[in-house]
UniProtKB/Swiss-Prot annotation:
Gene3D superfamilies: Beta Polymerase, domain 2, cca-adding enzyme, domain 2. Keywords: ATP-binding, Magnesium, Metal-binding, Nucleotide-binding, Nucleotidyltransferase, RNA repair, RNA-binding, Transferase, tRNA processing. GO terms for biological process: RNA repair; tRNA 3'-terminal CCA addition. It holds the Pfam family PolyA_pol. This is CCA-adding enzyme. GO terms for molecular function: ATP binding; CCA tRNA nucleotidyltransferase activity; magnesium ion binding; tRNA binding. It comes from Buchnera aphidicola subsp. Acyrthosiphon pisum (strain APS). The gene is cca.
Length: 414
């Protein structure tokens, strides 16, 4: 029985990246042998075991044969006569199909080390097309490694297009799709993930709402789309904010905000909350079971998009109402996130009409002015029940209005 280090640990070590998890493949072993050595079996579809001390994953070498549809439609063979190369050939990419023995020697039958040196993301074999999940994985690896100069091999991109054309993507669960997307949003360049999905024609399947943005024919105001909302502007913006903010909810919300742009012909200066745009985001989040902390910021930012970008012209009453609607009194961090997003919105291109670059700063300043209005003083005055809420709202509006009048000459409220 021989044991080899495989997968991401070998790849990341060769790339001089931090090794997070170590996965091992066992050649010539059996379930019985590993159980006798106190390994704990955890795999359902195929034998995977946890080491009794390190708790690292050890999988029996296996072969796979396509027997159905989707990423689960495989029969596996985990017999002790399965070779290391037979195990490695079933893997998705050459850079993930390198093994290392106990002496540090590399076993690299598919030239993964060479592809690492050349910065190439390339499939191992033609069986790549049998697993639709690989479309998402390749897009994620492209986002993960682009800063190191990696690109997808042309022949691999062609196979991804074939997977899409064969409609294999329909067999992926929403959970699988979101898991890969969430990982991509954590990378240094999440915009690359969506660009790759667009290029292989998969974006419209996974995110039809987002694909809508790529087609100017869908827009009421096509000249507006051409100038401000083409895919390059959208993805460049995501790249820009990703340099400044690592929060997944902020990055995801940035993409979602563009779903409001087709409302541009409406009288947006009078919109308080765009329930239609917000409902689209809510539907996306429900479909993928996206965590509530991400959903909430995305829905709020999209719904209040036009209000936030005309906030200088809004009444103090409406601004206080905004803080209440976003639950800012209990969750002040939401104001910070919405302010950040407001400073990176597509409407900032209208510099002559809006003070958009400063809208986020203004929002935060407004909140700092009113957040400390004392409830204790209101209670001392004898207010009860609903009267308490009415009075604290009145005092907040009054305090904000006083500050705005006092600072009216400072147009940008710095």
């Amino acid at each position: 029985m021989k044991i080899y280090l495989v997968g991401g640990a070998v790849r990341d070590s060769l790339l001089n990246l931090p090794v997070k998890d170590k996965d091992w493949v066992v050649v010539g072993g059996t379930e019985k042998i590993l159980l006798e050595r106190n390994f704990q079996q955890v795999g359902k579809d195929f034998p995977v075991f946890l080491h009794p001390e390190t708790h690292e994953e050890y999988a029996l070498a296996r072969k796979e044969r396509k027997s159905g549809k989707g990423y689960t439609g495989f029969d596996t063979d985990c017999n002790s006569d399965v070779t290391l190369e037979e195990d490695l050939i079933r893997r998705d990419l050459t850079i993930n199909a390198i093994a290392q023995d106990e002496y540090g020697n590399y076993i690299d039958p598919f030239q993964g080390k060479k592809d690492i040196e050349c910065g190439l993301i390339r499939h191992v074999s033609e069986s790549f097309i049998e697993d639709p999940l690989r479309v998402l994985r390749v897009a994620r690896f492209a986002a993960t490694l682009v800063h190191l100069g990696f690109k997808i091999a042309e022949e691999t991109m062609l196979l991804m297009c074939i997977i899409v054309k064969k409609q294999e993507l329909s067999y992926l669960t929403s959970n699988r799709i979101w898991n890969e997307t969430e990982k991509a949003l954590k990378t240094l360049n999440p915009h690359v993930y969506f660009q790759v999905l667009y290029e292989c024609n998969a974006l419209h399947f996974f995110f039809p709402e987002m694909y809508f943005l790529y087609e100017k024919k869908n827009f009421l105001n096509r000249s507006f789309f051409k100038k401000f909302c083409n895919k390059n502007i959208i993805l460049m913006g995501l790249a820009e904010i990703s340099l400044l903010n690592k929060d997944i909810d902020v990055r995801f919300s940035y993409l979602c905000q563009f779903l409001s742009v087709n409302q541009i012909d409406r009288n947006y200066s009078k919109i308080f909350f765009d329930s239609y745009a917000a409902s689209i985001i809510h539907s996306v989040c429900k479909r993928f079971k996206i965590p509530s902390y991400i959903r909430d910021i995305a829905v709020l930012n999209t719904g209040f998009y036009f209000f936030l970008n005309t906030i200088h012209y809004q009444s103090s009453k409406n601004i206080i109402n905004l803080f209440s609607k976003v639950d800012a009194w209990r969750k002040p961090d939401r104001v910070k996130k919405l302010a950040f997003l407001s400073n990176f919105n597509f409407l900032r291109n209208f510099k002559s009409e809006f003070f958009c670059i400063k809208s986020g700063c203004f929002l935060e300043k407004c909140f700092s002015v009113v957040k400390n209005v004392s409830i204790k003083l209101i209670l001392k005055k004898g207010f009860k029940g609903y009267e308490i809420k009415q009075e604290i709202t009145r005092l907040r509006i009054k305090k904000l209005e006083f500050w705005r009048i006092k600072n009216i000459k400072h147009r940008f409220y710095l």
